[in-house]
Amino acid sequence: MKKDIHPKYDFITANCSCGNAIKIRSTVGHDLNLDVCGQCHPFYTGKQRDVATGGRVDRFNKRFSIPGAK
């Protein structure tokens, strides 16, 4: 078998913007900076917002709706 064909698999630190530091193993070779993690992501913290962007149909109906009608 060939020797030294696999990349190094070392411990690195993934630092989140909230201050959380996570020790993980990776082949990247340097520490990572994360925007969100499990402690600050809105889905996991329960502070999720309902973003209703609406589509083209909603925008059309809003623009051309008759005032006083349903």
From Swiss-Prot:
PROSITE patterns (UniProt xref): RIBOSOMAL_L31
InterPro entries documented for this protein: Ribosomal_bL28/bL31-like_sf, Ribosomal_bL31, Ribosomal_bL31_A, Ribosomal_bL31_sf
Binding site for Zn(2+): C16, C18, C37, C40
Cofactor binding note from Swiss-Prot or TrEMBL: Binds 1 zinc ion per subunit.
Cofactor(s) listed: Zn(2+)
GO terms (BP aspect): translation
Keywords: Metal-binding, Ribonucleoprotein, Ribosomal protein, RNA-binding, rRNA-binding, Zinc
SUPFAM superfamilies to which the protein is assigned, alphabetical: L28p-like
A Pfam short name: Ribosomal_L31
Gene Ontology molecular function: metal ion binding; rRNA binding; structural constituent of ribosome
Cellular component GO terms, alphabetical: ribonucleoprotein complex; ribosome
Subunit structure: Part of the 50S ribosomal subunit.
Stated role: Binds the 23S rRNA.
The family this protein is said to belong to: Belongs to the bacterial ribosomal protein bL31 family. Type A subfamily.
Record's protein name: Large ribosomal subunit protein bL31
Organism listed in the record: Enterobacter sp. (strain 638)
